[in-house]
Structures are given as C-alpha cells and as structure tokens.
Amino acid sequence: MSKVAIVGDFHLGVAPNNSLKFETLFESQQRFFTECLIPVLKARKIDTIIFTGDLYDQRRRIDSKIAQYVEGLFQNELKDFKCIVLQGNHDTYYKDDLTVTSLSNIWSKPNVTAITKITPMELFGVKFLFVPWLTSSMSEKFIENVDKVAGRFQYVVGHFETMGFPFEAGSICTNGMNPEILYNNFKNTISGHFHTQSFKEVNGNSIHYVGTPFQLT
C-alpha cells in the first residue's frame, strides 16, 4: 500500500545577508533531511512526498551552493521517492507571473513532478487537485470556476494565502482568499505558505496549514 508524506515550506537559502545565520540554518536544514525526514519516510515505507511550496527562500537570486545541494538532493537522497513539488511565491521570480521559477533546475528529474499550474492528479485511487501560488489573474479564475470542480476531489493541496489563519505565531492574515471559497467547495484543503501549523473545520470541511518543518529564525 502506497503512503504519502506532506511537508511544508523549507525556504532553503534563508538569511543570505547574514553569513553566519545562513550557514547555520543551511547546515540544520541538511541535517533535517539526512537525519530526520528521509530515515522516517523509509521506516514508514512512504514512497511519495508532496512539497507544498517555497522550497527555496530567495525569489531572484539563488546561492550556487543551495542550487547544487537541491539538485543533488532530488537526484540522490530522494531518488527513490516520487516527489510532487508545488511552486510557491518564493520559488517565483516575478511577483505576479509564474513563468520563471527556481524549480526549473529539478523539474527534469524523473522522480519530480513540478506543479506550476493548477493540476488534477489521481494518486493511488485518490483524486487530488494541486494548486501552486496563485497570481492575481489565476486567483480570479480559480474563484470564478471553483464551483465547477466542487466535490470532485478528496484533497486540494495548495500554496494559499487565506484570511483568518496565522501566518506566524500571534499574527493573523487579514488579506488573501476568503476561506469560505475553500470550505464551500472542498472536503479537505491542505496548504503551505504560512509558517505556523493550524487547522480549522467548518461543516465537516477542513483547511490545514502544515507549517514549516523547522524554525527559520
């Protein structure tokens, strides 16, 4: 029986302007993969990993050491896993256009599926809808057409900015998408983007922000 792991924003390459912090966090992130995540996935016989966006931290300038590490990570340590990687806003060069993305250095890997547009997919008999970071025009189209796909998917996995959810401890998002759009059309919504884990349920339909897997500050 196949199993899926869902992991939140990694922000590899965070704090580029502080060399000590950059190196400390990068070493910690590497240890998380080699000493925690990968051993746990193998022990639990998980074969598919869904990354909910923001694999990288810097939108416009990727440190060459980070780029080389990420390429090697998916080519070597993660080669036995099917990896579904959503494009987050930090993986996107332009603020409101997804065409240029830092994920381009891994999407040719045979084990990687990069989600750069809204993509339906069936995994192990379960219907998923994958939603990358939504530009303003994409968000408008998503909202206009969401009722056409309502009830068709067991899980929606995205990189949503949703009002009323904490993006950090003690800070609530006051902008973005009205959560009713997700509650009214999907049974289970799972999202990256916000760094604090949270869960809310309305009339049996839920939104779950998975949060970051480690401290980023």
Predicted features along the sequence, with ranges:
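Core catalytic region of metal-dependent phosphoesterases/phosphodiesterases
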Residues: 2-3, 10, 14-120, 182-186
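Hydrophobic/aromatic residues located in beta-strands of well-ordered beta-sheets
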Residues: 49, 83-85, 128, 154, ...
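Conserved beta-sheet core of the metallophosphoesterase superfamily
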Residues: 163, 168-217
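Binuclear metal-dependent hydrolase catalytic cores centered on His/Asp/Glu-rich metal-binding motifs
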Residues: 123-181
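Short, well-ordered alpha-helix to beta-strand connector turns
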Residues: 46, 125, 151-153, 186, ...
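Short acidic-hydrophobic surface loop/beta-edge motif
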Residues: 117-125, 200-202
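Active-site-proximal beta-strand elements of phosphoester/diester hydrolases
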Residues: 3-14, 125-134, 155-159, 207-211
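Active-site glycine-centered loops adjacent to acidic/histidine catalytic or metal-binding residues
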Residues: 9, 53-54, 88-89, 159, ...
